[in-house]
Amino acid sequence: MKNSIKSILIICVLFAGFNVTAQKLGHVNSQAIMQEMPDYDAARKELESYKNDLTKELEMYQKLIVEFAQDYEQNKGGMSAETRQRKETDLMERQQNYEKKAYEAENSLQQKEQQLLQQIMLKVNNAVKDLAEKEGYSYIYEVTTLLYAGGEDISDKVRKKLGIAVTAN
């Protein structure tokens, strides 16, 4: 019994020496902040222009394929079997090239979007990190991934740090 009491007292003394501090938690909606940045509008416009250029290029290529197919259909009656076979093969190759170009255009568009938005997201992340270090936050969570957002919403502080006007809620 005496050993149990001594053990409990020793444990109490040990834990009394620890300085228990509350962790400062915050959350931020970086997507909303990002969309409010002037850089975001410029990136969206650049991306839209890039998409339009790719679309025009694909439409022109598709138009050439349609014209080739129509020409083939109109003139296939007067063609030899060998010429018809060559034209059909050519048409299939053109269609496959079009599909390949469309796939490459989609990938290129996604890469461009990622490249443009990554630079903006980096600015937001750096502002969040700066704020966390200066104001002593232990953790800052992205609000879009949480079911419950406890702690302080630092989104307006990040907006101010990035020079974005903050409206009163």
How would you name each of these model-derived features?
Residues I8-G17:
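Bacterial N-terminal signal peptides
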Residues Q23-N169:
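Amphipathic, charged alpha-helical segments and their helix-to-coil junctions
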Residues F18-A22:
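Sec/Tat signal peptide C-region and signal peptidase I cleavage site
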